[in-house]
Amino acid sequence: MIDLSPLARRLAGTPLATWANGLQAQLDAKMEKGHGDLERWQSALDALPKIQPSEIDLINGLRLDTDCDDATRAQMRTALMGLSPWRKGPFDLFGVHVDTEWRSDWKWSRVAPHLNLEGKRILDVGCGNGYYMWRMLGAGAHSVIGVDPNWLFFCQFQAVQRYLSEPSVWHLPFPFEDLPANLEGFDTVFSMGVFYHRRSPIEHLLALKDCLVKGGELVLETLVVEGDQHQVLVPEDRYAQMRNVWFLPSVPALELWLRRAGFSDVRCVDVSVTSIEEQRGTEWMKYQSLSDFLDPNDHSKTIEGLPAPMRAVIVAKK
């Protein structure tokens, strides 16, 4: 059983206290339903060596280390490989380099300079395996809660958390929709790589705003296209082989949507074309990746002939 009482204690006396007190029952019910692969992933977690880090670096990356022998490292590698595919990272865990599909550290280096997370209560929507949550903690956050219904990502988070018995970072295997309306308890809310999967983009923005305290900050990272405030791409079918992509606005259109949803001080702090160096297949993620989804003769287009992935980071205030 995963004990959420430290989370409830951490959030006592905050606007999130009532919600936090009900999370244990919600998690227990979710765990009881489970997932077909959960037993296999749990076996991988159980196979992790029982060691403690003497060195922890969450500022320059995510690195844990201590004196350990080759046999321990081999055991660590085998157990972590049992939780493949690893998409967000990289992680350096006791001499084992988990070379994930995404160089998420590159994205973080583009986002982090524009934020002050010191002492903040943070919600990470669609948090994946929690890579960014640990980086948020490294940036001084008071507490970080991530929600993502993917059970493999939940188990990958557990693999790291067992070496960082940190009462400030929590992964809840829930969809964002399971959060109560009008929480209004987080200082900063992140939605990175989620927006384009939403059928109702304005509804998503309003739901994110509902999670923030007055004056709180939204960090929104999503796929965009070139153009003015009237330019929005809605793919006919797939986009870069993804079925569930709905709206790719231009940056001016996205800024307009945010203002319309009631946000202020809306700023675009970064726009980057995703390269095949930033997202690629590795031995830790052996499936197709970005290079397979682009036109082989013209990397400025997807395989469907649409503009290649370009991502913007927008920061806005409630």
From Swiss-Prot:
Keyword Protein biosynthesis included in the entry's annotation: no
EC class of the enzyme, as a word: transferase
UniProt KW keywords: Transferase, tRNA processing
Coiled-coil portions: none
Enzyme Commission identifier(s): 2.5.1.-
One Pfam match: Methyltransf_9
Any GO BP: tRNA wobble uridine modification
MF (Gene Ontology): methyltransferase activity; transferase activity, transferring alkyl or aryl (other than methyl) groups
Keyword Secreted: no
Catalytic activity: carboxy-S-adenosyl-L-methionine + 5-hydroxyuridine(34) in tRNA = 5-carboxymethoxyuridine(34) in tRNA + S-adenosyl-L-homocysteine + H(+)
InterPro entries found in the cross-reference section: CmoB, Mo5U34_MeTrfas-like, SAM-dependent_MTases_sf
Binding site for carboxy-S-adenosyl-L-methionine: 88, 102, 107, 126, 192, 196, 311
HAMAP family, A to Z: tRNA_carboxymethyltr_CmoB
Subunit structure: Homotetramer.
PANTHER family listed in its UniProt record: METHYLTRANSFERASE (PTHR43464), TRNA U34 CARBOXYMETHYLTRANSFERASE (PTHR43464:SF95)
Function statement: Catalyzes carboxymethyl transfer from carboxy-S-adenosyl-L-methionine (Cx-SAM) to 5-hydroxyuridine (ho5U) to form 5-carboxymethoxyuridine (cmo5U) at position 34 in tRNAs.
Family recorded in the similarity comment: Belongs to the class I-like SAM-binding methyltransferase superfamily. CmoB family.
Name by which UniProt lists this protein: tRNA U34 carboxymethyltransferase
Organism annotation: Pseudomonas fluorescens (strain ATCC BAA-477 / NRRL B-23932 / Pf-5)
Organismal lineage: Bacteria, Pseudomonadati, Pseudomonadota, Gammaproteobacteria, Pseudomonadales
Gene from which the chain derives: cmoB
